[in-house]
Amino acid sequence: MKIRILLTAMAALAAAGATAQSAVDAYSVTPSELRGTARFVGMGGAFTSVGGDLSTLGQNPAGIGIYRRSEVGATVNISARNYSTATPTMKIDRDNTKFYFDNIGYVGTANLGNNATLRSFSWGVSYSRLSSFERLGHGYNGTTDGSMTNYIASFTNGTNAADLRFGEKYNPYFDSDCDWMSILAYNAYMINGDGVYNDKYKGLYGNNTVGDAEYTFRESGHVDEYNIDFGGNISDVFYWGIGFGILDMEYNRQVYYSESMDKADIYTLPSQRTVEGSADWAMNNSKWISGTGFNVKFGVIFRPIEMLRIGAAIHTPTWYSLNHQGGATVNYDYYNPGAPESTNPDTQNPLKGNDYTGDENNMLYSYD
């Protein structure tokens, strides 16, 4: 008969593994794109010693001292992206064109006179989108030669089955170092013991199995920075500035993966043995990272002669407070002509959050 199993794990990360995965995921959301005003992007971001542009508020705050008058500006970015997904049986192309405000800012300048040592004093605020995480994809494989469950079984080998089972006062997600996917798959009967050893496992795909697979993923989110800068012009030779950056980060990823198999090796509960039958399973995997950061920037520009400018800036590490949440849901249906049987295991674990600190280049700011 047909059996349905629903198993849910929220933030199913063992304590020892949470930090490592978070570091990897953090790297994937580290700002790495060249964004800003059209002038800034056209110059490849080489404005450390040039100044006089709204984008320099987040690069070298001394650039604000170059301003002779107040300015308001905004930059619109058209992001034209095409995603192509190919499998042995099909190819899918998708367009994901969007409009963004990459930069909005204001600089106010007070001219104090050409005879004063401090010729002018400027202040400014700006908003900049440092990164945008917009990706989507879909794929289908009409003829598979394996199963994700067999892969899970391969890296679960060596783990004692008792460590994967739930007990009255035992939760393997938090009380063991087992991989969360191993725990999820084992308790959903997607992987099962080989019948001989307590630490050897096999998946649903057997010698006679045929099937197909499908997946869909979507990423969204951003890293935005808000800058507040102050700077001045000393004798038209030395320009200085200090800036305070506040960052807002949000990253979301949704992944759906499913398999449908005939003549799969399915495990029956009453007989506790493996028989051939039809198996369909799907996993929804979600991840959310959100938080804020703060940094301080110091900058100078030296102009000894009219045609030469030398600039330098120091950025403090960016201190982040990040909340990392994740969850996975598995639906597993299988059919065999044996005796009636049913099971409905269900687990729910609380969400978890973590804080990280790093600099803008090597930030512990958790893609698979």
Q: What does each model-identified segment do?
A:
Residues 13-15, 71, 247, 317:
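Single-residue recognition of alpha-helix boundary sites
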Residues 62-63, 234:
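Short amphipathic alpha-helices and their capping/turn segments at secondary-structure boundaries
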Residues 7, 23-31, 89-94:
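Generic N-terminal amphipathic/basic segments
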